[in-house]
């Protein structure tokens, strides 16, 4: 039996008006069973149910943060587990989705990296996170207008499935998201960055998890070599910008005594010369056994001031969902106060 959400909307079964009805049930109404699609003929519903399924999850658990963020812990039909994070703001609703079970990049300060790599998610398993979160929050799927591929996994190492998921997210008859509100984050896969630049029909935004401006420090905190060298990453970033004209976000997790020295701020400014970019400084979010601490507020401010004085567009990102284990770098299938529900 095929998973319907793995298909591009243009390849959905049924024809013409009936296909549009099917797409509306799935992506606008968020219906999870074919029986509920009452304006489709009974014969069509029966045939769909024989050939396709709509739900890749065996179980869904939630952990709610005091700041309104919600971590969703999904158990897939094969027993594997992964997570997504819902972040409501006054002016928007954002979701952070996973592209893998675990992650092969093994960033030393990231709880997901400590899990190791399980498997790639399919396009439908990525998209289904949005539908499941919308259902869990009692909102329509299209009310979630911002999406970041920043959950578990290195999206560039699951490239084809992630691109298919992005096309489904953007499709006007599916979730209809704006390409300007979808961001893909990578630890620095130069080949993938160049491939993304060539995806003319997408136009989604790019964020690079740099975390250090010098090779010695970067190899210490990203030890597996999943990413390219800083020089290779920045060359690919410049190629990407030359093709797309888009600003690139650089993510920089602040690790006390590791990558927060002022000479590293100066070097980072040098590395970014000529690139239209924005740097997000992210205080490290704690997790058991990490062996790292966040930089102090004073050191983060000094690092910020040094970059700003050099003309770098920079901000400090305050993570949400820390108390639920849902903040950046904390996703590791932990369940403080989880609430379980049937999928």
Swiss-Prot record:
Keywords of the record: 4Fe-4S, Cytoplasm, Disulfide bond, Iron, Iron-sulfur, Metal-binding, Methyltransferase, rRNA processing, S-adenosyl-L-methionine, Transferase, tRNA processing
GO molecular function: 4 iron, 4 sulfur cluster binding; metal ion binding; rRNA (adenine(2503)-C2-)-methyltransferase activity; rRNA binding; tRNA (adenine(37)-C2)-methyltransferase activity; tRNA binding
Enzyme class: transferase
Annotated positions binding S-adenosyl-L-methionine: 153-154, 185, 209-211, 285
Bound cofactor: record note: Binds 1 [4Fe-4S] cluster. The cluster is coordinated with 3 cysteines and an exchangeable S-adenosyl-L-methionine.
Gene Ontology CC terms, in alphabetical order: cytoplasm
EC number: 2.1.1.192
Major place of residence: cytoplasm
Pfam families named in the record: Radical_SAM (PF04055), RlmN_N (PF21016)
Cited InterPro entries: Aldolase_TIM (IPR013785), Methyltransferase_A (IPR040072), RlmN_N (IPR048641), RNA_MTrfase_RlmN (IPR027492), rRNA_lsu_MTrfase_RlmN/Cfr (IPR004383), rSAM (IPR007197)
Active-site residues annotated for this sequence: 83 (proton acceptor), 328 (s-methylcysteine intermediate)
Catalytic activity: adenosine(2503) in 23S rRNA + 2 reduced [2Fe-2S]-[ferredoxin] + 2 S-adenosyl-L-methionine = 2-methyladenosine(2503) in 23S rRNA + 5'-deoxyadenosine + L-methionine + 2 oxidized [2Fe-2S]-[ferredoxin] + S-adenosyl-L-homocysteine; adenosine(37) in tRNA + 2 reduced [2Fe-2S]-[ferredoxin] + 2 S-adenosyl-L-methionine = 2-methyladenosine(37) in tRNA + 5'-deoxyadenosine + L-methionine + 2 oxidized [2Fe-2S]-[ferredoxin] + S-adenosyl-L-homocysteine
Binding site for [4Fe-4S] cluster: 103, 107, 110
Keyword Oxidoreductase listed: no
Protein localization: Cytoplasm
SS bond partners: 96-328
GO biological process, one term: rRNA base methylation
Domain Radical SAM core residue range list: 89-323
NCBIfam families: rRNA_mod_RlmN
Purpose: Specifically methylates position 2 of adenine 2503 in 23S rRNA and position 2 of adenine 37 in tRNAs.
PANTHER family with a match to the protein in the record: 23S RRNA METHYLTRANSFERASE, RADICAL SAM CORE DOMAIN-CONTAINING PROTEIN
Family: Belongs to the radical SAM superfamily. RlmN family.
Protein name: Probable dual-specificity RNA methyltransferase RlmN
């Amino acid at each position: 039996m095929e998973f319907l959400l793995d298909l591009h909307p243009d390849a959905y079964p049924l024809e013409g008006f009936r296909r549009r009805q099917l797409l509306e049930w799935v992506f606008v109404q968020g219906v999870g069973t074919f029986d509920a699609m009452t304006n489709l003929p009974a014969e069509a519903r029966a045939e769909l149910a024989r050939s396709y399924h709509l739900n890749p999850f065996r179980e869904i658990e939630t952990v709610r943060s005091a700041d309104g963020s919600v971590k969703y812990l999904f158990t897939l039909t094969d027993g594997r587990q992964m997570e997504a994070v819902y972040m409501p703001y006054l002016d928007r609703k954002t979701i952070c989705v996973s592209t893998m079970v675990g992650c092969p990049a093994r960033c030393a300060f990231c709880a997901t990296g400590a899990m190791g790599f399980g498997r790639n998610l399919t396009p439908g398993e990525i998209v289904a996170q949005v539908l499941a979160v919308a259902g869990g929050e009692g909102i329509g799927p299209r009310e979630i207008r911002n999406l970041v591929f920043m959950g578990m996994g290195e999206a560039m190492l699951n490239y084809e499935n992630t691109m298919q998921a992005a096309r489904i997210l953007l499709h006007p008859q599916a979730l209809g998201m704006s390409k300007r509100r979808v961001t893909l984050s990578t630890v620095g896969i130069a080949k993938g960055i160049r491939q993304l630049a060539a995806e003319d029909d997408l136009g989604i935004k790019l964020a690079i998890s740099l975390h250090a401006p010098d090779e010695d420090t970067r190899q210490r905190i990203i030890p597996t070599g999943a990413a390219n060298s800083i020089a290779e990453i920045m060359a690919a970033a410049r190629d990407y910008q030359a093709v797309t004209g888009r600003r690139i976000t650089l993510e920089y997790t602040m690790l006390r005594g590791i990558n927060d020295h002022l000479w590293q701020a100066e070097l980072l400014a040098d590395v970014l010369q000529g690139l239209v970019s924005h740097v997000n400084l992210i205080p490290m979010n704690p997790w058991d056994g990490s062996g790292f601490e966040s930089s102090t507020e004073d050191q983060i401010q000094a690092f910020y001031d040094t970059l700003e004085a050099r003309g770098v567009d920079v901000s400090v990102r305050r993570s949400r969902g820390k108390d639920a284990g849902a903040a950046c770098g904390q996703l590791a299938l932990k369940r403080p106060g989880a609430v379980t529900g049937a999928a």
